[in-house]
Every structure is written in C-alpha cells, then in structure tokens.
Regions:
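A short, charge-rich alpha-helical start-of-domain segment used by transcription regulators
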Residues: 1-22, 32-35, 46
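C-terminal edge and immediately downstream basic/flexible tail or linker adjoining helix-turn-helix-like DNA-binding
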Residues: 2-9, 101, 137-138, 155-172
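Sigma70-family region 2
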Residues: 2-3, 39-57, 76-78, 160
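Structural recognition of an alpha-helix C-terminal capping motif at a helix-to-coil junction
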Residues: 22, 36-43, 56-68
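Arg/Lys-rich amphipathic alpha helix in sigma70-family domain 2
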Residues: 53, 64-85, 100
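DNA-recognition helix of helix-turn-helix
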Residues: 67, 71, 139-165
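Internal acidic/polar
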Residues: 80-104, 109, 131, 170-171
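A short pre-motif secondary-structure segment
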Residues: 121-125
Length: 172
C-alpha cells in the first residue's frame, strides 16, 4: 500500500471495524473466527484500496467481502449453534440493553441454526438495515432469491421461536 493510502485506510478501518466484526460474528457465531475474518477483510482492503471509489462503495465492498469470507469459513469449519453474545464487547447495531436481553440472546442462538443463505439475508436486512435490493447487490444474488430467502428465513425463525421460546410468549 502506498503511503498516500495510509490515512484513508486507517479511517476506513476505524469507521467500519465494528460492522465487519459484527457481521462475521453473527454469521459464524465464533469470536475467534470472526476476528480472523475481520483481519482478512481489512488485509484485502489494503490490497484493493485503489479500486475503492467512494465511502459508500467502501461500505458496500466491506459488507460483500465480509459476507463472502464468513460463508467460506462456515463451509470450511461447519460452525454450529453458539451463543453470539458471549464475550461480545462492542456490538454494532444494538444497544447495551438489547445485548443483555435473554430473549435477544436466545434469538441469536436460533438465528445461527438457520441455513447460511437465509441467515445471511436476515443479518443484512435486520442488523445492517439493508433493502432487499441492497442485499441482492451485496450477496451477488437475484432479487427474487433474496426475497425468497428473507421470507423462508423469517418463517423458519418464527417456527423455531414458537418451539424454543415458549417462556417469552404470553399465555403459553
């Protein structure tokens, strides 16, 4: 990386490291693996910085690479069912009250059990607040596929919640 890129690279790391780590953590459920993925993503950013056209493009690029690396890691290591809140110090997108919520922790446990395409779509939709069109662009998938994955993922998550979270339902 040329010296001219150093301040820009450092700014991008400062602005987006929480988001990158959080996405990797939600996708893998493994803190160590999420840290590895985040490091790999920023090393790739270092090599690709000259191709980044704007701040919006950088954010899009980081999300896409993080999701891709997380998916690859999940396929390699076949990580399953881990409490995502354990030892998580700085969580992007949720307040402290939500992080400590037993219901939130249980939902995270259920989320990690979803098939990867559905989990990826739901994480990008509800953690990153992306539109289905933005999710399709990030994942490189057709819009119809993304909408289907969101619908199937929500349906499956609701079914799992109805079975596993009865203590949180009134009158149950």
């Amino acid at each position: 990386m040329a010296r001219d890129w150093q301040p820009q690279f450092e700014r991008l790391v400062d602005e987006h490291q929480s988001m990158v780590f959080s996405l990797a953590m939600r996708m893998t459920g493994d803190r160590g693996l999420a840290e590895e993925i985040a490091q790999d993503v920023f090393l790739e950013l270092d090599r690709s910085l000259g191709k980044i056209e704007s701040a919006d493009h950088a954010c899009f690029w980081l999300r896409r690479v993080t999701m891709s690396r997380s998916t690859d890691a999940m396929r390699r290591r076949k990580v399953r069912g881990v409490n995502l809140w354990v030892e998580m110090e700085d969580h992007h997108g949720l307040g402290v009250e939500e992080q400590a919520s037993p219901l939130g922790a249980r939902l995270e446990e259920l989320l990690i059990t979803l098939p990867e395409p559905q989990r990826a779509a739901l994480v990008l939709r509800y953690q990153e607040d992306l539109t289905p069109e933005e999710i399709a662009a990030t994942l490189g998938a057709p819009l119809a596929t993304v909408k289907s994955q969101l619908q199937r993922g929500l349906k499956l998550l609701r079914a799992k919640a109805a079975t596993h979270l009865k203590e949180y339902v009134r009158g149950a």
